[in-house]
Amino acid sequence: MALPVRDIARSRAFYEGALRPFGVKVVESPSGLGFALGDQDFWIGEGDVAAGSVHIAFAAPDRETVDAFHVAAVEAGGVDNGRPGLRPRYHSGYYAAFVLDPDGNNVEAVFHGDH
């Protein structure tokens, strides 16, 4: 996935901090910046940001990673958009947290648990 951002330096600081609990590795390229998270990858680059927000979800290996993501993302300048907890309206084991990034995108960490 690639996401346009208004300010790549500000977004880099946010995503490096927010995704640290996932063991993120940063990959730089001439066209943008990548974040490698095991078998997931995520790219940002400066560009026109769409009106409204995009919803991005990262699969966490456990609840502790979801909790750590929420703390790290808020510390990195994100805005709380849903504290860690169960979301049974999705399914019984859906444990997630939500934070708005510097461009207003809804960033989620989710652990699916047993369902």
Regions from the language model: what does each represent?
Residues 106:
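Glycine-rich acetyl-CoA-binding "A-motif" of GNAT/NAT acetyltransferases
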